[in-house]
């Protein structure tokens, strides 16, 4: 265990359980992305871990995660 900070964040999920699991995995990847703290989301309509994008602030992350959620359809697995 190195000197890693625990990053807490509000979970932005969707009404689809499968989506929530995938988005949560994306956030987990974001917390270890790069050498600085990262907040994670993915490109609109894409899921992590294939498309991981890290942001420097929670505000940017929340904005992009909300955008992603709007673009993801429930029949995507």
Curated annotation (Swiss-Prot):
A Pfam family annotated for this chain is Ragweed_pollen
Asked if the keyword Disulfide bond belongs to this entry, the reply reads yes
List keywords of the entry alphabetically: Allergen, Disulfide bond, Secreted, Signal
Signal sequence span per UniProt? Answer: 1-22
**Could you name the Gene Ontology cellular component terms for this entry?**
extracellular region
- On the tree of life, the source organism's domain of life is Eukaryota
Q: List the disulfide bonds.
A: 26-61, 33-48, 40-54
- By its UniProt entry, which SMART domains does this protein fall under? Amb_V_allergen (SM00816)
Q: Where does the record say this protein resides?
A: Secreted
- What protein does this entry describe? Pollen allergen Amb p 5b
**Highest lineage ranks of the organism?**
Eukaryota, Viridiplantae, Streptophyta, Embryophyta, Tracheophyta
